[in-house]
């Protein structure tokens, strides 16, 4: 096993522990708490994949961080902070919409890279909007927290989320997953649009009809693989 993979996991475990202690003191905001819950699932998945105990990894990560801090000067810290782009949290959904349980009469599931796509294939002839909560850096989508598909009546009929065992994804992964979800829902004569906020940060533009500017290759994939793959 690559030593960098192990040490990265160890550092992530310790940093999660620090953030959890901070949250336990009721000092974290909603995006901070969302990341803690998401990262906890990710760490559990990585622990199983790597075969490494989380508690032992947390202790090892603490030693790595302590060594780095001992070698870090205040000036170097200022330079590193200045070079990192500031992320911000964008919310299409309310906390209630994010946390609400939902059920599928005809469940369908597909994996697109590190993202899981779920939809209810019993949904017919509905007007559907895709809404998401995500982080943004340099005015582009950075990390998808959660995407859900809502009917005009407010029912949840689809979702895109991260796989805990495969952390990390790109904006292209998100756009591909959205294309698959749209294709699956449109197969049953539903009309699907993407929120203007999500269009703007994922594609850099927004259309009034709610249809993102998918590349021709992706349009062909949406049209030709939905029935067999989703």
Curated annotation (Swiss-Prot):
PTM comment text: Upon interferon induction, ISGylated via host HERC5; this results in the impairment of NS1 interaction with RNA targets due to its inability to form homodimers and to interact with host EIF2AK2/PKR.
Chain positions of motif Nuclear export signal: 137-146
Per its UniProt record, what Gene3D superfamilies does this chain match? Answer: Influenza virus non-structural protein, effector domain (3.30.420.330), S15/NS1, RNA-binding (1.10.287.10)
Primary location recorded for the protein, binned into one broad class: host cell
What residue stretch is flagged as signal peptide?
none
**UniProt keyword terms in alphabetical order:** Eukaryotic host gene expression shutoff by virus, Host cytoplasm, Host gene expression shutoff by virus, Host mRNA suppression by virus, Host nucleus, Host-virus interaction, Inhibition of host innate immune response by virus, Inhibition of host interferon signaling pathway by virus, Inhibition of host PKR by virus, Inhibition of host pre-mRNA processing by virus, Inhibition of host RIG-I by virus, Inhibition of host RLR pathway by virus, Interferon antiviral system evasion, RNA-binding, Ubl conjugation, Viral immunoevasion
- The domain of life is Viruses
Segments of this protein annotated with the region PABPN1-binding: 223-230
Q: Where is this motif: Nuclear localization signal?
A: 34-38
- Any domain commentary? The dsRNA-binding region is required for suppression of RNA silencing.
Tell me which family the UniProt entry assigns to this protein: Belongs to the influenza A viruses NS1 family.
The name this protein carries in UniProt is Non-structural protein 1
- Native organism: Influenza A virus (strain A/Gull/Maryland/1824/1978 H13N6)
């Amino acid at each position: 096993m690559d030593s960098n993979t192990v040490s990265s996991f160890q550092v992530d475990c310790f940093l999660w522990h620090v953030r959890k202690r901070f949250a336990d003191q009721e000092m974290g905001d909603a995006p901070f708490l969302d990341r803690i819950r998401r990262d906890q699932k990710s760490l559990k998945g990585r622990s199983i994949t790597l075969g490494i105990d989380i508690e032992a990894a947390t202790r090892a990560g603490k030693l790595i961080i302590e060594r780095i801090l001992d070698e870090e000067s205040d000036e170097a810290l200022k330079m590193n902070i200045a070079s990192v782009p500031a992320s911000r949290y964008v919310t299409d959904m309310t906390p209630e919409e994010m946390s609400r349980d939902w059920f599928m009469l005809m469940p369908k599931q597909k994996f697109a890279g590190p993202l899981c796509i779920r939809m209810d294939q019993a949904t017919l002839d509905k007007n559907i909007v895709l809404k998401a909560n995500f982080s943004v850096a340099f005015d582009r989508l950075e990390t998808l927290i959660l995407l859900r598909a809502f009917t005009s009546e407010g029912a949840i009929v689809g979702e895109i989320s991260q796989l805990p065992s495969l952390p990390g994804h790109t904006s292209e992964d998100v756009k591909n997953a959205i294309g698959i979800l749209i294709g699956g829902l449109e197969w049953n004569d539903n009309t699907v649009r993407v929120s203007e906020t999500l269009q703007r940060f994922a594609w850099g533009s927004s259309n009034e009809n709610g249809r993102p500017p998918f590349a021709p290759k992706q349009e062909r994939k949406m049209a030709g693989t939905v029935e067999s793959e989703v």
